[in-house]
Design a protein with these regions (language model features):
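Alpha/beta enzyme core
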Residues: 2-224
Length: 224
């Protein structure tokens, strides 16, 4: 009863642990077009705890399968906040490895995974029951294909390419997509044409979520 009063949901993780969360995947999807959510990436347990106390909606946490302890510490510091673990791009070289890596993240506390995988790998993970957030627009580790670390979607051809990628993630079963450094008008148009939650990072206010770094939210950086 106290949990419900706090607006939390009782859940069981994919790893079989009981817990409480501010959002489930269904809750997040229900907010599309209703409320713009705030997402952040903490780099320390202290930042994660502060973000939860401040009421940040969701978090992304870096997950290293060879050293899971930092991600586990983040989960412990913010036990009630929906948390996607960002998995390394090159840690999975097949659909089977993608599912295995996703399961490793979910077992230690992830509510979802965030990845730079192809639709084929995303489909394998979602078919295994893992909520997945893809990555479109400027994907830094794939930036050689888009001309380097710069804005993407500045031409009609690029804009259509970004939209196509997002629709491929949608078809693969993803629930969300991080959209990085594309024109604000393009993200606004895409958000209306996909069922995915769009998380804007440097792409203006047209997304369903605003992805902000914890240092900026918490004021850890001196003003310019």
């Amino acid at each position: 009863r106290d949990v419900a009063k706090k607006g939390l949901k009782r859940i069981m993780t994919l790893g079989g642990a009981y817990g409480t969360r501010n959002y489930t995947v269904k809750d997040l999807r229900d907010q599309k077009g209703v409320k713009v959510l705030v997402e952040t990436v903490p780099f320390t347990p202290e930042e994660a705890a502060a973000a939860e106390e401040a009421g940040v909606d969701t978090m992304k946490v870096r997950f290293d399968p060879s050293n899971p302890e930092p991600a586990i510490a983040m989960r412990s510091a913010a036990p009630n906040t929906f948390m996607a673990f960002s998995v390394p791009l090159v840690a999975a070289a097949s659909e089977t490895e993608a599912v295995r890596l996703a399961y490793k993240a979910m077992v230690v506390g992830a509510d979802a995974i965030m990845c730079q995988w192809s639709p084929r790998f995303i489909s394998a993970a979602t078919e295994a029951g893992v909520p997945v957030q893809g990555h479109a627009g400027l994907v830094p580790r794939r930036s050689t294909w888009t001309g380097g670390l710069k804005a993407v979607g500045m031409t009609v051809e690029e804009a259509l390419w970004v939209f196509q990628k997002i629709k491929e993630f949608e078809s693969a079963g993803a629930y969300a997509v991080e959209v990085e450094v594309i024109p604000e008008e393009l993200l606004a148009a895409i958000s209306k044409r996909t069922t995915l939650l769009t998380s804007s990072i440097g792409a203006g206010s047209g997304g369903d979520m605003q992805f902000l770094f914890a240092e900026d939210i918490l004021g850890n950086n001196p003003p310019p």
